[in-house]
């Protein structure tokens, strides 16, 4: 019996009761139709399940409930969830950036940041460039993939600079890594769920103003930089690690020999990613000068560039091995829980 009263089961029960409560309310309660009340119930139930149960399979419950709405039905529900460009954009972007995490790109960029002359001037200079590197890389890679890829390298940094795990400086670098990865996931929509959801919801709202990837980044990146500076100031003046002066930043130069030069595969992957980003941001840059180009690319939705990038990576191969392995990318690179939640959240928002 104890297994019945778990947080999971109680949350599911409460969610169903919330839907039932709004379903049983009389028509025109609070001036809303019966179907609108039902939709509100589904919205609150979805929030309860996402917060207390999970973001993946409970999203299917939300989709199923919306499919029961008379004005939707299951055909329209499927078109509005898995058939919308937001979900396709996120899916293709997850697949596209996966090969990047399998290269030495993360280590290469980080080493370039933390071994320059300015970064080696002192411990806090080093910290600023390390957090800056993590934030920069996070602009293009999903947070979960980046954290898994970066953690082993952080261990190497500890060893080279003689930073002890559990020390105040060690804890600061670990916390800062997690914070910077989370922060960067809100600065661009590239492989990131929440910016993609926000852009989709705003485009489908009563205002109905579609936000391009460039417009989002023009606001998100400066805001993220301000928050990054604030984070470093909090660490320096409030957290104040007393052992940070023991870091010998000159040793960071030893990290340069830990990776080989970029091979042709890595260069090809980066070139394709640059092309995709160009197709995302270039229409907004030449909107007035080249309106036909703007209309053409924008009319293909934001899902077109990553789809093109995926196709190129599947086609291009070196030594008989394609840049992108479909099975590996879809099993290890795609955050399916995020895909399901995006599909459900997009549809719930449109329903409301």
Whereabouts are the PLM-identified features?
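Helix-loop interface residues and adjacent transmembrane-helix termini in multi-pass membrane transporters
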Residues: 51-54, 102, 210
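Alpha-helical transmembrane segments and, especially, the helix-loop junctions at the ends
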Residues: 134-152, 168-210, 223, 227-237
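Alpha-helix capping and helix-loop boundary segments enriched in small/acidic/polar residues
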Residues: 32-36, 83, 87, 100, ...
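Membrane-embedded alpha-helical segments and adjacent helix-loop junctions characteristic
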Residues: 58-164, 332, 337-352
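Membrane-interface alpha-helices at helix entry/exit sites of multi-pass transporters
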Residues: 119-129, 159-175, 208-219
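Hydrophobic transmembrane alpha-helices of multi-pass small-molecule transporters
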Residues: 1-89, 215-351
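Peri-membrane helix termini and adjoining interfacial loops of integral membrane proteins
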Residues: 64, 104-109, 196-204, 244-250
């Amino acid at each position: 019996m104890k297994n019945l009263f778990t947080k999971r089961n109680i949350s599911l029960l409460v969610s169903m009761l919330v839907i039932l409560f709004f379903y049983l309310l009389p028509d025109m309660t609070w001036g809303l139709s019966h179907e609108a009340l039902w939709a509100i119930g589904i919205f609150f139930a979805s929030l309860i399940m996402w917060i207390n149960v999970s973001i993946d399979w409970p999203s299917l419950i939300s989709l199923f409930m919306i499919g029961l709405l008379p004005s939707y039905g299951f055909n329209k529900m499927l078109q509005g969830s898995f058939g919308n460009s937001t979900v396709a954009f996120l899916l293709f972007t997850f697949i596209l950036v996966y090969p990047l995490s399998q290269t030495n790109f993360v280590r290469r960029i980080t080493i370039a940041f933390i071994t320059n002359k300015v970064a080696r001037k002192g411990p806090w200079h080093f910290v600023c460039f390390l957090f800056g590197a993590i934030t920069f890389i996070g602009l293009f890679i999903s947070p979960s993939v980046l954290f898994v890829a970066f953690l082993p390298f952080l261990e190497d940094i500890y060893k080279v600079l003689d930073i002890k795990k559990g020390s105040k400086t060690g804890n600061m670098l670990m916390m800062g890594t997690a914070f910077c990865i989370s922060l960067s996931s809100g600065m661009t929509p590239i492989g990131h769920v929440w910016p993609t959801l926000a852009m989709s919801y705003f485009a489908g709202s009563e205002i109905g103003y579609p936000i391009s990837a460039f417009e989002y980044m023009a606001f998100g990146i400066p805001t993220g930089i301000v928050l990054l500076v604030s984070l470093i100031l909090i660490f320096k003046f409030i957290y104040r690690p007393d052992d940070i002066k023991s870091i010998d930043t000159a040793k960071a130069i030893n990290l340069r020999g830990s990776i080989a030069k970029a091979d042709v595969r890595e260069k090809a992957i980066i070139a394709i990613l640059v092309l995709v980003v160009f197709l995302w941001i270039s229409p907004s840059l030449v909107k007035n000068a080249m309106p036909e180009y703007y209309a053409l690319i924008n009319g293909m939705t934001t899902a077109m560039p990553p789809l093109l990038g995926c196709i190129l990576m599947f086609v291009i191969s070196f030594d008989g091995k394609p840049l992108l392995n479909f099975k590996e990318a879809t099993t290890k690179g795609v955050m399916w829980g995020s895909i399901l939640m995006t599909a459900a959240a997009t549809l719930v928002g449109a329903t409301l």
